[in-house]
Amino acid sequence: MAEITAKLVKELREKSGAGVMDAKKALVETDGDLDKAIELLREKGMAKAAKKADRVAAEGLTGVYVDGNVAAVIEVNAETDFVAKNDQFVTLVNETAKVIAEGRPSNNEEALALTMPSGETLEQAFVTATATIGEKISFRRFALVEKTDEQHFGAYQHNGGRIGVITVVEGGDDALAKQVSMHVAAMKPTVLSYTELDAQFVHDELAQLNHKIEQDNESRAMVNKPALPFLKYGSKAQLTDEVIAQAEEDIKAELAAEGKPEKIWDKIVPGKMDRFMLDNTKVDQEYTLLAQVYIMDDSKTVEAYLESVNAKAVAFVRFEVGEGIEKASNDFEAEVAATMAAALEK
């Protein structure tokens, strides 16, 4: 039987990522054949990964990588936040983001077939990681964003990598693009412009806003405060030319009723129209980047601020770890019972 030296164990660990005992056992089982030991560890890793396949992995990290005029944002999941801080896990995330940015796959199937620095496919690398780390490690999603030579990427990660953002800005510079990405990370817009909002979605969100106003008015009535008006509109998409023209006419009629001289209306109407637009685009302000108040200058929307510096936002992607994943709530008694049952089966 071949001698299993510490040097051989170390070499296998470096190539496979396996622990000391697993590496030594694999070498013993394969009579010191390094290649066979690697294959054996891979097979065992696939078996371990299969056992963990039905677990919920809702923690993890985002990865962001820029490759020239292409940027990738990815999400990789683990079962616990503790593992998400593991050096091996962090390296896997960073390598995956780089491989995807450079490989430019069109879907997850193509992404999983890409070759990692280890020589494994991306899919195999995640099986290996699941086996060596001891938790289900899964590649969840990615997005690729492209720009022209004249445009700028803003790459930003927040909260230790739990949020990853790429923004494309035309005009300005990389620093401005990064500031916009910081805004996106903080304010959670879902689309760039109101033109991307579904009409039914706007209708439903407006109903929710008015329901909240109704509840607020009940509280206000109890302390003899005047009721707040309900909102007629929620998005710029609903503000047709006719609606805007009627709003302006209503404002002028109000000024006339108040006895304001007509010669000063031109100074008053624009401000009141701005207020009308602000009050009737609440859904846009919640969900669209361009309509949100800019965190770097709260006197302007993102769109207005960028216009003031001869720039505009073209696109963005924002990933937050665990979005849309339902985390399992463990029943402690059931967990203990399952552990005991598993022990009895052995």
UniProtKB/Swiss-Prot annotation:
Domain of life of the organism encoding this protein: Bacteria
Gene Ontology MF terms in the entry: translation elongation factor activity
GO cellular component terms, A-Z: cytoplasm
Residue ranges of the region described as Involved in Mg(2+) ion dislocation from EF-Tu: 80-83
Compartments, record wording: Cytoplasm
Family, as annotated: Belongs to the EF-Ts family.
HAMAP family documented for this protein: EF_Ts
Role description: Associates with the EF-Tu.GDP complex and induces the exchange of GDP to GTP. It remains bound to the aminoacyl-tRNA.EF-Tu.GTP complex up to the GTP hydrolysis stage on the ribosome.
Protein name: Elongation factor Ts
Source organism (scientific name): Streptococcus agalactiae serotype V (strain ATCC BAA-611 / 2603 V/R)
Lineage: Bacteria, Bacillati, Bacillota, Bacilli, Lactobacillales
Gene: tsf
